[in-house]
């Protein structure tokens, strides 16, 4: 007999339909799985065989052929255990599947219990788009799957409860759409940071325009503390943005079972020992890397010169294109990676170069060599470079309260609303992503501004890319100032954010 069971697969962060076809015929007992299965899918034969027997069903002593269609696409993971098991039971006549169009995903243990799998949300959204009426997933994935509104989602504990549901003896109840409750924790606040008003202003500009920023300063000056508070002034995520981020984290297996929706801008801070595939994504079965896990959020690289140069170079494509592409023999996958790059570093090996205390003992050659670990093309992609000096005693003991994140965030949201209206109907989300055409349209300069930019270009030896980034930052400063046109003071502030020299002089 022949049976077909609906299931789903993953390509990047998008799901697609997979049909599990099972054909049982007379002949020498054999169990073949075709349709480009990987090792985990092939091993499903033994898991399914044991689960069927341990759940009280009879495993067919026949020739069994399973095809995972489309046969030309590689199938990976353990999520096909459940549809394979149901296909065998249906083809052998031991179980009658529902007539309505349903999809099944889940790993099956040897005793017949269902275990969670990764990537459930993108597959659930695909199931809804394809036209499935019901989706059956392991219990631990049911809240995540319920985020796909418009399809009935059932959480299944084991094969026996699923069989009872099909027979009508004990129907399962569909899971209601999960809604987020109260936030689990407060984000770190800028009111905790003493002084450093210039750095705070630079981070406000960066947040308002989505600009990349580099913080340079001695140990203990507050670089990491400032960077970790950046998410607290970023605008709220839209529903579409939250779902997009959640899909990426679902594929990476990083979602909480109790709180499956990513509702805040991500903040990722990998260690400097991370490899290039760990940063960009990769593996034999590609998975998202840190640049994708930081999508719509912040990627913080502390101690920037300590990262391997080849690791940092993989940032160039996602910083320019907002997407990272991973090519393998089995195919190519792309992951979105539109993030704010926030970097922090010391000005030399000991960390005290240029400090008025005179504690630095590094030679000029040593300083230049240390700073030279960062390539020019990568620095060109950083919009704002700001110095974070060490604090003196009077600044540390200042009693005046610092401005809270909520106040800064209101200004950032106002600037982002201006940009949202400006770029409505285009793929651009913020000033940092302006195309050359949009720059000509929205970054027109008066003769006074042009003169100021000309002087900065000549004096600072700016590249064409650096010139464009100064203009983008100036446009953001104008938005924060509620100015429809870029003024000389906006240019002056934007140029100030490029004056710190990373050449050890």
Residue ranges: model-predicted function:
Residues 215-256:
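Walker A/P-loop
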Residues 1-214, 218-224, 327, 466-467, ...:
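Peripheral, non-AAA+ core regions of ATP-driven protein-machinery
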Residues 296, 302-303, 314:
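Walker B catalytic acidic pair
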Residues 217, 281, 303:
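The Walker A (P-loop) glycine that initiates the GxxxxGKT/S ATP-binding motif of P-loop NTPases
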Residues 18-24, 279, 383-386:
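Short beta-strand elements
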Residues 215, 301, 344:
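Hydrophobic anchor at the beta1->P-loop junction of P-loop NTPases
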Residues 34-45, 58-60, 67-77, 286, ...:
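Basic, amphipathic alpha-helical bundle interface domains used for macromolecular binding and assembly
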Residues 204, 261, 266, 273-299, ...:
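Conserved alpha-helical scaffold flanking the Walker A/P-loop in AAA+ ATPase domains
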């Amino acid at each position: 007999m022949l049976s077909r069971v609906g299931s789903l697969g993953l390509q990047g962060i998008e799901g697609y339909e997979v049909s599990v076809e099972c054909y049982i015929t007379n002949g020498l007992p054999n169990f073949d799985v075709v349709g480009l299965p990987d090792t985990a899918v092939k091993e499903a034969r033994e898991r399914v065989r044991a689960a069927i027997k341990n759940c009280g069903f009879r495993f067919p002593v026949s020739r069994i052929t399973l095809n995972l269609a489309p046969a030309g696409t590689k199938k990976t993971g353990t999520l096909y255990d459940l549809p394979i098991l149901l296909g065998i039971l249906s083809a052998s006549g031991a179980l009658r599947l529902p007539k309505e169009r349903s999809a099944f995903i889940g790993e099956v243990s040897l005793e017949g219990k269902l275990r969670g799998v990764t990537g459930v949300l993108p597959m659930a959204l695909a199931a809804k788009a394809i036209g499935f009426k019901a989706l059956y997933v392991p219990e631990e994935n049911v809240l995540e799957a319920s985020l796909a509104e418009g399809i009935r989602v059932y959480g299944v504990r084991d094969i026996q409860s699923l069989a009872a549901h099909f027979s009508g003896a004990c129907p399962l109840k569909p899971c209601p759409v999960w809604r987020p409750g109260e936030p689990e924790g407060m984000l770190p606040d800028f009111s905790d940071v003493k002084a450093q008003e210039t750095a705070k202003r630079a981070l406000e500009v960066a947040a308002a325009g989505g600009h990349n920023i580099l913080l340079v300063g001695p140990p203990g000056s507050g670089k990491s503390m400032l960077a970790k508070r950046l998410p607290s002034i970023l605008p709220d995520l839209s529903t579409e943005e939250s779902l997009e981020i959640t899909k990426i984290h679902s594929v990476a297996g990083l979602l909480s079972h109790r709180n499956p929706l990513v509702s805040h801008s991500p903040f990722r801070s990998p260690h400097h020992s991370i490899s290039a595939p760990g940063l960009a994504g990769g593996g034999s079965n590609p998975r998202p890397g840190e640049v994708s896990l930081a999508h719509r959020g912040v990627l913080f690289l502390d101690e920037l010169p300590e990262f391997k140069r080849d690791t940092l170079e993989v940032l160039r494509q996602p910083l320019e294109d907002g997407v990272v592409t991973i090519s393998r023999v089995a195919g190519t996958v792309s992951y979105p990676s539109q993030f704010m790059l926030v970097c922090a570093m010391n000005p030399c090996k000991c960390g005290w170069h240029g400090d008025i205390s005179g504690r630095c003992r590094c030679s000029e050659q040593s300083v230049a060599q240390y700073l030279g670990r960062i390539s020019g093309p990568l620095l060109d992609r950083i919009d704002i470079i700001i110095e974070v000096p060490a604090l003196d005693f009077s600044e540390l003991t200042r009693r005046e309260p610092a401005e809270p994140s909520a106040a800064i965030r209101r200004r950032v949201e106002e600037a982002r609303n201006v940009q949202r209206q400006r770029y409505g109907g285009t793929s651009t989300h913020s000033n940092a992503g302006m195309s050359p055409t949009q720059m000509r349209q929205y970054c027109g300069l008066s003769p006074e501004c042009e003169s100021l930019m000309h002087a900065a270009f000549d004096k600072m030896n700016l590249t064409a890319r650096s010139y464009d980034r100064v203009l983008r930052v100036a446009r953001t400063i104008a938005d924060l100032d509620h100015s429809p046109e870029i003024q000389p003071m906006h240019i002056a502030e934007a140029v100030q954010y490029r004056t710190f020299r990373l050449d050890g002089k």
